[in-house]
């Protein structure tokens, strides 16, 4: 990822601010790496690892922000862990953890095993600009949160970017939704991603019967 320095203005700074918002810091997503954003980031890093910070966002700092952009983190099971305790520690739900880890027996957790832990916030942001970076992070997060989603690519754009798809279901009749296919016109991207997120969430919660459908 690009290194960001104090005073920088870019959509990537918006993503830093989005991650900090999700981590509990009330700052504006104005795309400016200014004093308020730096202060929030200092507090975030100090809480996470006790590190001091000079407001230069490098790969190490990005790595600490990524869970809040992808919507999940990984947890190594320790002796005495329970799903209920893990869920409380990460402020999420047991059902969300079970959806992301469908093969796990909640009554027989294996010490040393790794769990994907979805955070409780909605993954698809509605108040930031979209780029291929954010699109990729969201797709990764959705497929971790809802492993019954299948992700692939149908080719590459004129700019050399992969064109991804999500699929759900295995039925004979297919319904295909597409968008964001004219150069840098991204406005339909969050619409489709939000639709996919809400659809997958409803299916995981048993609120709809889609048994033989493609999305």
Spell out what each predicted region is:
Residues 1-31, 36, 68, 75-78:
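Acidic, Ser/Thr/Pro/Gly-enriched interdomain connector segments
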Residues 5, 25, 29, 44, ...:
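Calcium-binding motifs, dominated by EF-hand helix-loop-helix domains
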Residues 14, 18, 39, 84-85, ...:
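Residues within the helices of the helix-turn-helix
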Residues 19-23, 44-47, 194, 198, ...:
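Active-site catalytic microenvironments for nucleophilic, acid-base chemistry
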Residues 27, 31, 51-56, 103-107:
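Short solvent-exposed coil/turn linkers within tandem alpha-helical repeat scaffolds
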Residues 35, 59-214:
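M14 metallocarboxypeptidase catalytic domain recognition
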Residues 35-46:
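Short, solvent-exposed alpha-helical surface patches in non-cytosolic proteins
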Residues 44-51, 67-71:
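Short, basic alpha-helical nucleic acid-contact segments in DNA-binding proteins
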